[in-house]
């Protein structure tokens, strides 16, 4: 019992750092942007109304939608949009058109994650460093350079991994939540009447009096739920109970106290609207607060960067992006990975955002479209999971998700008003990633169709070969093939040029499935072909780490004995040539060919020993 309590405490502390780091830093800019937009007349009544809307937004979207409803839709203990997409896809697998539509929606939602991933670190770190302007206006010119230095250092250390410093994320973020709550308490004590804004009638009254203004300011109010989707995305790391406990015991109370403290300050000092968070603090605490805020925003950004690596790996395994160079940064934790291309592409996009928008207020205009559309997509997928996966009655499904759908739609509609002010930026990034994903997926389909059309039946081929068998050499040859039952090009090249066949031959096809994990008991499907040849299907979930030698070691005891020192892996390296009249526009064919050319080899992705790999090239027209 004592051990389970300490384990729960450790997981809860970890969740505070990783799950709630992003939403915890929203206090830096949310209230400032609502009143700084110029749409809300600065009156005590409006302060009450805005605070009430902020509180009930947190309650509705985070507490009710994500913590209560969405966390229930786990995929074998895993969360995130890809896990939800896999659940929804499986739930409607007998409805191919609906399944295709949901896959398209889900992939688009996943691509929007990268758009959000550019804005969030930029606005978080920039808003923290902007606290220096409150210390002294002379620091204003240093804000952009300091922000870029902090961001560069953050991305530069990624290749070393975060397993060492990761253990401090929870404690530091807990100190942050304690600090922001402590900032708010004196101001609430000075104006306890501000707690009246907890009543929803202030929010409803504001909406009733100013429906147009209410709709417009939702584009700024959404800043208070930045990172809400992390609750679901990190489900597999921490579990439901620690995430819920961390929210209701630490994050939600601290955020509420700080927001209401800012509201109390604005009632007493309306001029504090230019930066109410930092102006709550006494002068002596400003520099330490800027340092603490910068640390908190770096931790929040780190969680997002780690998430980008994880999502990219999952998308690659589902076949929507080409293989990239993936490095493991921890021997003990296989989930700790580093993808150089994603790291520096994200860094350059964030630098572009900081240089283009130059302030957290300008970046606030860019924030919202991608994340609210993601939230909307999550609600849609949740409906199909509980309707077709859990088989709940239609009326109950509509009741459970309909309200959240309308709330998400209102926030998305409001953020569309910011499209020209900056909302186009994350939407553009998401659209580019979506185009790349769909081009790769369609290109692979065309490539596989071409391979199937030209394929030679493996059984018939082996029967013909064994009529007049070539020289057999010691050892095992592993031939990778995209289609089971087809002769791999590498085998044809090997017989043509070397005129030998190994003593044991495995024809291996790797399949990735729309489930997070596939256990070792279901890893292999083996079919004997005769003549010491086997057809092997290797199955992985999108969160499994592909390790082909490790998987093939399970062949022992099935009539095939593999020795690592005498096993060679034969891979076909296809050179794709675009042709006129295929299933894609010419520019997409050329793009696919370039992506295929730049893709990392299968050897590294499948963890093959480099000194045992033989690559043989072939040219394919699509």
From Swiss-Prot:
Give me the reactions it catalyses.
K(+)(in) + H(+)(in) = K(+)(out) + H(+)(out)
Role of this protein:
Transport of potassium into the cell. Likely operates as a K(+):H(+) symporter.
Q: Which residues cross the membrane?
A: 8-28, 50-70, 103-123, 137-157, 169-189, 215-235, 247-267, 285-305, 337-357, 366-386, 393-413, 419-439
On whether Ligase is a keyword of this UniProt record, the answer is no
Q: Which organism is it from?
A: Paracidovorax citrulli (strain AAC00-1)
Q: Which residues form a coiled coil?
A: none
Q: Where in the cell is it found?
A: Cell inner membrane
* Alphabetical keyword list: Cell inner membrane, Cell membrane, Ion transport, Membrane, Potassium, Potassium transport, Symport, Transmembrane, Transmembrane helix, Transport
Predominant location category: membrane
Q: What is this protein called?
A: Probable potassium transport system protein Kup
Q: Which gene encodes it?
A: kup
